[in-house]
Amino acid sequence: MQEALNQKIDAFVAANKEQILKDIATLVSINSVEGAPEEGAPYGAGPRAALDKTLELAAGMGLATRNCENHIGYAELAGADAEKYLATICHVDVVPEGNGWTEDPFKMEIRDGWMIGRGVADDKGPMVATLYALKFLKEEGVSLRYPIRALVGDNEETHMHDVDYYLANYPAPVFCFTPDAEFPVCNGEKGHFDGKLVSPVCNGVIKDFVGGVATTAVPDRASALVATDITKLRNAPNITLEPEGNGVRIRGWGKSGHAAMPEGTVNAIGLVVNYLLDNDLCNDAERAYLEAVKKLHDSTAGVGLGIDCADGPFGPLTIIGGKMSMVDGRMVQTMDSRYPTCTDGDTIAKQIRTAIGTGAELTDVGSAKPFYIEADTPAIKACIDTYNEVTGENATPFTMGGGTYARHFPYAVSFGPEHSDMVLPEFGGPMHGANEAAPIDKLLEALKIYIIALLRLEEIDF
């Protein structure tokens, strides 16, 4: 019976491959970065357009669809149970494209078996895969015990207000998985702490300081405009100098990456901060602020701020500074930390305030606790067993620093579609980075995994 099912799924995937890629390209072509709220578009015109198009694609597959007051939507297959339902949830909003692209970020390209474009991995490719999982079940005429909803989020990258709205106005699923991380199964996510380091109005040497495109990404570019003579400045690695007006524009060139996985990145804001300090391009108030910010950038483990810690399930705390800006004469540096169970948001805030002293003010603090679900629960076992059978691996669940929709639901995990051992091609980049890339064969394999997992979840007594 299992072999016959495998053959049916393989035939379905092969027959639909080209259309799957076309549908992903359609969603990628929509710039769905969060924008200013509009009438009927609480998260901006781009996310609303992506939501509408996704529901249109689902309807074209014969799935029932619903737009939940423009905050979120879903495609659905009916089931016998009128009270309980299963769900998947993906998102069709994306982070800003940022710098460094060699391709148009909103025109999907295919090269050597890889898709390239903003959202191919996070999370438009997986969104399309979940729709096709429901399409398979519909075409096969499977009688479902529990209805299945493929939820379509459009505010994941910033605030997740979409899922907050949904859970406040609609019943929660008995189990939900989100294809927005790595395989096999992530059954725990670190806590999330964010805030801003704000300077006083310094009226000093630094006239402008900008860097980064998202608070959740390590910036690869940053620059400061300072009132000085370029002939007095020295060269430094990853720093360029150019005259601008009556001063000098100092640019830092780093390497971008996701805030939850900062290993191997180079923060361009930190490069500029160090250059300003090393060359005394600041007055006393600016120096005090930059010294505070330097403590943030000195270590992605939080050593400089005195917040470093680690535990067994989650490993070490991470922290990055994603964006720098000048607002009303004040420098503003954002922070994004993913923390394990050995600390909490209040403790982190207290430790940071101690570390920065009077040089900066910590503002706009927010935090969310870690969450963890035991790996031996029936739904998680169904997911992990399916993954191992399809791939031939003997993988076990893991925890991570990334934050997904899963933490918002009573019983949920993230489930693929990426792989921790995936090696990006020279022309490809990571989620949130330039030239975001995803392998076609692995996404199609994920589609097979999702179909079988949903069938197994249907058999569980929730």
Model-derived segments and spans:
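Acidic, glycine-rich active-site loops and adjacent beta-strand->loop/helix elements
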Residues: 92-94, 148-159, 179-184, 213, ...
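Zn-dependent metallopeptidase/amidohydrolase metal-coordination segment
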Residues: 12, 385-386, 390-460
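Substrate-recognition/cap regions that form aromatic- and gly/pro-loop-enriched pockets
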Residues: 326, 331-402
